[in-house]
Swiss-Prot record:
This is NADH-ubiquinone oxidoreductase chain 1. It is a multi-pass membrane protein. The gene is ND1. It catalyses: a ubiquinone + NADH + 5 H(+)(in) = a ubiquinol + NAD(+) + 4 H(+)(out). It holds the Pfam family NADHdh. Coiled coil: none annotated.
Length: 316
C-alpha cells in the first residue's frame, strides 16, 4: 500500500464515523478501523468481535478533531505533574460526553453516562479542594517537590482526615466498590462504558505523588503501595452496595463542607505562622490565645453536634 492511499484512507476514517453493524433489533455495533485492510488485519477480518456501545477511547477510535493529551513540563524540560493535573483530569467529564457522539447512537447509554458523570462531579470538587490543602501546606506546585518535602514527616499524619477523604473520594470517582453504581447498571444500559479511559492513567500517579513520602528505601516503594491495595480490596470485601442518593449526599453534604473547612483552617494557620515568625516576641502570647480559642471552638462544636444528634428527630 502506497503512502498517498494510506493517508487518504486514514483521512476518510477520521472524518466520518465507522459503519454500523446491526447485531440484533436492539443492539448496534461498529466496525473497527482498518478492518477491511489486508495490510493491517490480514484477510479482511475484524480486529475484535466485542460489542461496542459507540466509538470511544476504550474502543481505540479517536473522534475527529480530538486534541492530543500532553503532560505539562517544568522549567528544566522534564515532564512532571503540577496543579494542572486537576485541569487535565477534569476534561474527561465534558469532553467525554461531548466528544463521543453518544446521543446519535444510544440514548440509554447517554443517560447512564450522565449519571456516572453526576456521581463523579462532587467527589472531584472535593479532591480539588484537598489538593489545594496539600499545596498550601507544602508550598511548591511540582509533584516531585511535593514528594521531597515529605522527607521529615509524612503529610498523612497531621492531615489524616484529609487523607481519609482523599482515599474515599478516589474510590467513588474510579467506581470502585462500594461505589460501583455505574457498573451495577451494566446489564440494563451499560452507561459506564460511555466513559472513561483516563481514570486508571491519571488517578494512580496523582494519588501516589500527593501522599507517598519522599524518604528513600524499600518502605516508600512497595509497602505503601501494598497497603493502599489492601485497603481497596478490604473496602470491596467489607462494604455493601449503597444507594445513589446516599452517595450524592455524602459527596455534597459531607465531603465538600469538610474540605472547604480544611482549606480555611490550613490557610488561617499558615497566615498565623507567618505572622508569628515576623514577630518572635509575641509567640507565647499568641500561642496561649490561639489554644484558648481553639478549645472554646472545639468544645462548642462537639456540644452542638451531640445536641443535634440527640434532638434531630425534633428538627426533622
Amino acid at each position: 500500500m502506497s503512502w498517498p492511499i494510506l493517508t487518504s484512507f486514514m483521512r476518510s476514517w477520521t472524518t466520518k464515523p465507522p459503519p454500523q453493524i446491526k447485531m440484533s433489533p436492539m443492539r448496534l455495533s461498529w466496525q473497527e478501523p482498518f478492518f477491511d485492510c489486508d495490510f493491517f488485519c490480514g484477510f479482511g477480518q475484524v480486529i475484535e468481535a466485542k460489542e461496542r456501545c459507540f466509538p470511544s477511547v476504550k474502543s481505540r477510535y479517536r473522534p475527529p478533531h480530538a486534541p492530543p493529551v500532553r503532560l505539562p513540563r517544568n522549567r528544566k524540560g522534564r515532564t512532571g505533574a503540577r496543579a494542572s493535573w486537576v485541569g487535565v483530569k477534569s476534561r474527561k467529564r465534558g469532553g467525554g460526553l461531548l466528544g463521543t457522539f453518544t446521543p446519535l447512537y444510544s440514548k440509554y447509554a447517554f443517560l447512564g453516562a450522565l449519571r456516572s458523570a453526576a456521581q463523579m462531579v462532587p467527589y472531584e470538587v472535593s479532591i480539588g479542594l484537598i489538593l489545594i490543602v496539600r499545596l498550601i501546606c507544602v508550598g511548591p506546585r511540582n509533584s516531585s517537590e511535593i514528594v521531597m518535602a515529605q522527607k521529615q514527616i509524612w503529610s498523612g499524619i497531621p492531615l489524616f482526615p484529609v487523607l481519609v477523604m482523599f482515599f474515599i473520594s478516589r474510590l467513588a470517582e474510579t467506581n470502585r466498590a462500594p461505589f460501583d453504581l455505574p457498573e451495577a447498571e451494566a446489564e440494563s444500559v451499560a452507561g459506564y462504558n460511555v466513559e472513561y479511559a483516563w481514570d486508571a492513567i491519571l488517578n494512580s500517579p496523582l494519588l501516589a505523588e500527593a501522599n507517598v513520602p519522599g524518604x528513600p528505601g524499600t518502605h516508600s516503594d512497595n509497602k505503601i503501595t501494598l497497603f493502599i491495595l489492601i485497603g481497596v480490596d478490604a473496602c470491596r470485601g467489607r462494604e455493601l452496595f449503597i444507594l445513589h442518593s446516599k452517595l450524592m449526599n455524602v459527596g455534597w453534604k459531607v465531603f465538600l463542607p469538610l474540605s472547604l473547612a480544611w482549606v480555611v483552617a490550613v490557610s488561617f494557620l499558615q497566615i498565623l505562622l507567618l505572622f508569628i515568625k515576623a514577630h518572635p516576641n509575641l509567640r507565647r502570647d499568641y500561642a496561649l490565645a490561639l489554644s484558648y480559642h481553639l478549645y472554646n471552638w472545639g468544645s462548642s462544636f462537639i456540644d452542638g453536634f451531640f445536641f443535634w444528634k440527640r434532638e434531630k428527630k425534633n428538627f426533622l
